[in-house]
Amino acid sequence: MARRPDDPPIDSHGFGPQVISLFLRLVLVAGVSLRGAPRAMATISEALGLELAVPCWTTGRLWLLRLGHAMLTAELSEADDWAWLIDHSVQIGQEKCLVILGIRLSDLPERGQSLRHEDLELIELLPAKSWTRGEVDQALEKAVGRTGHAPRVIVDDHGVDLTGGVALFQQRHLETVEIYDAKHKAACLLKSRLEKNPRWQEFQTGVGQTRCSVQQTELAFLTPPAPKPKARFMNLGPQLAWAKRVLAIVRQSRRAGILQSVSAAEALPSAARLKEKLGWIEAFADDLADWSQWQQVVDVAVASVNEQGVYKGAAALLAQRFWQLDALGESAKQLAGQLVEFAASQECRVRPGERFPGSTEVLESCFGKFKHLEKQQSRGGFTQLLLGFGALLAKVTTATVRAALQTSRTADIRSWAKQALGVTVFAQRKLAFASATEMG
């Protein structure tokens, strides 16, 4: 198809900023795969009679990497009010990637609004095979060169290597304080209550057995959600919600004799069948009431920190929100008290008039979005596509696309990958299989 006269190519790229922006928005905003984006563009072009020039997916991939590289190397404001959010991303292989995102305290969204991807700057993206406390400290010191000053605050999940590295960094930068991510703290409190609780262990056993026994039967629609392999106590909500709904269904079926049909064509299983496979949940009715209240308390705390941040008065606001919850049991009140105490300990680190981010949840969200971008490739370890992480934070407009492609070249991508990644797991696999084929 012809190039549109109102979208002249950027330098020697052969495509204009409008087409490039459309490709990137399909991938970054709409969640279309890199290979699927050209097909989507061709479909849109044909349906609307736009006569768009459609790029190859490999060309679009390079645009994505160059946008990410531009975000990683963009000039940042030199200021002493930076907040850094730090965490590791892990994939197959030995490497872990340390990611540092940042936002100036003066640029935080108003209270009541959570941080968004586009609010943040990419300060560092550092894959490495080893992350000791000393190595984290060195990485943080290197990142100071990007912002001109040590950050006012670093928010992390208190992983041993991260918090240890931050402690070493603080010995040289006394003005920097550390904030413990609220969601991880809440998950630790739940873990301390549940992990060794015999009733919880029995419940988990029942959930696992139910998943195996009903997923290939007429009760498949009641299959419990699969547990998260990591961060289990940060993701209890779906499982508890499932259990409460199933408990209500079992009780309703016992009263009615049979459930109402979902459609006129097919009736749902009988009360006897439901009791056979799911009746065990009734024995956990009281436990579920307690556990669900604990989850409710945690959800309120995490939402409050995400939307309000850490400031003088944050603990009082959280206590007020807990007071507004209906009929909390004694154990839930104790958990709420622990979370208020935690909020008070965090706000002691804030000066009057300051407000800090209190959560790395937006960074965790970026990790999730990046894994969606990688799709199956995440099973092959980190590759050049790691640079695409920076593109997740970009506001994709024709202006930002033009600027990125003019400042970050393909040669820059290759140079960064060679220095940061070396020989990747994917490259090792390719070489090994090639040599095995030749020998065969």
Locate the predicted segments by residue.
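RNase H-like nuclease fold core
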Residues: 3-15, 19-25, 29, 34-36, ...
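Enriched - but not universal
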Residues: 38, 60, 66, 85, ...
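Short alpha-helical "patches" and their helix-cap loops
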Residues: 38-44, 382-387
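Acidic/histidine-rich catalytic cores and adjacent linkers
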Residues: 149, 159-169, 208-440
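A catalytic-pocket lid/entrance helix-loop region that shapes and gates access to the active site
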Residues: 196-208
